[in-house]
Swiss-Prot record:
Its EC number is 3.5.4.13. The gene is dcd. GO terms for molecular function: dCTP deaminase activity; nucleotide binding. HAMAP family: dCTP_deaminase. Keywords: Hydrolase, Nucleotide metabolism, Nucleotide-binding. The keyword RNA-binding does not apply. Gene3D superfamilies: 2.70.40.10. It comes from Koribacter versatilis (strain Ellin345). GO terms for biological process: dUMP biosynthetic process; dUTP biosynthetic process; nucleobase-containing small molecule interconversion. Pathway: Pyrimidine metabolism; dUMP biosynthesis; dUMP from dCTP (dUTP route): step 1/2. The lineage of its organism: Bacteria, Pseudomonadati, Acidobacteriota, Terriglobia, Terriglobales. Homotrimer. This is dCTP deaminase. DCTP binds at K107, S108, T109, Y110, A111, R112, T131, L132, E133, Q152, Y166, Q176. The keyword Hydrolase applies. It holds the Pfam family DCD.
Length: 184
């Protein structure tokens, strides 16, 4: 399994619609960078956010998650409360090939401010907008900028095609369109 270069990512985006919309160079001027990089793609966060609040619940239960645990906003910025988190989605829609797995890593600009991004791998043949988990590890409110870079996706291509893909097993987050809460 090898990490894929900018040439491969560009070709797959242009010929197979793997990333849409796709920026074939890194946009950096006056923004938190996004677009194609040497060995990855920096995705952007959309202007839709769900900010966690504990007003309605005393416990977080992934098997019985209450949508009322979030305040939904649409804005150019999201203020994540101290020691809390928000959910968001990517601007880009991804279609992952059957022989590819992705890993997401946070951007250093946010990490140096105590903001951590968590995204599980995009499995072979998964497609959709990415639901992003943004944690504020600081004791102060943290600002997230919509339509700017949030994290980097690294693409790994296997030397053989998987037996069962995410699409084959009818994964519960397949073709997600917006911010999707936990499902069982």
């Amino acid at each position: 399994m090898a990490i894929k270069s900018d040439r491969w990512i560009r070709r797959m985006a242009q010929e197979h619609d793997m990333i849409n919309p796709f920026y074939e160079k890194q946009m950096r001027q006056g923004v938190i960078s996004y677009g194609l990089s040497s060995y990855g793609y920096d995705l952007r966060v959309a202007d839709e956010f769900k900010i966690f609040t504990n007003v309605n619940n005393a416990i977080v239960d992934p098997k019985h998650f209450d949508e009322k645990s979030f305040v939904t906003i649409t804005s150019d910025v999201c203020i994540v409360p101290p020691n809390s988190f928000a959910l968001a989605r990517s601007v880009e829609y991804f279609k992952i090939p059957r022989d590819v797995l992705t890993i997401c890593v946070g951007k250093s600009t946010y990490a140096r401010c105590g903001i951590i991004v968590n995204v599980t791998p995009f499995e072979p043949e998964w497609e959709g907008y990415v639901t992003l988990e943004i944690s504020n590890t600081t004791p102060l409110p943290a600002k997230i900028y919509a339509n700017e870079g949030l994290c980097q996706i690294l693409f790994f291509q296997s030397d053989e095609v998987c037996e069962i893909s995410y699409k084959d097993k009818k994964g519960k987050y397949q073709s997600q369109k917006g911010i999707v809460l936990p499902k069982l």
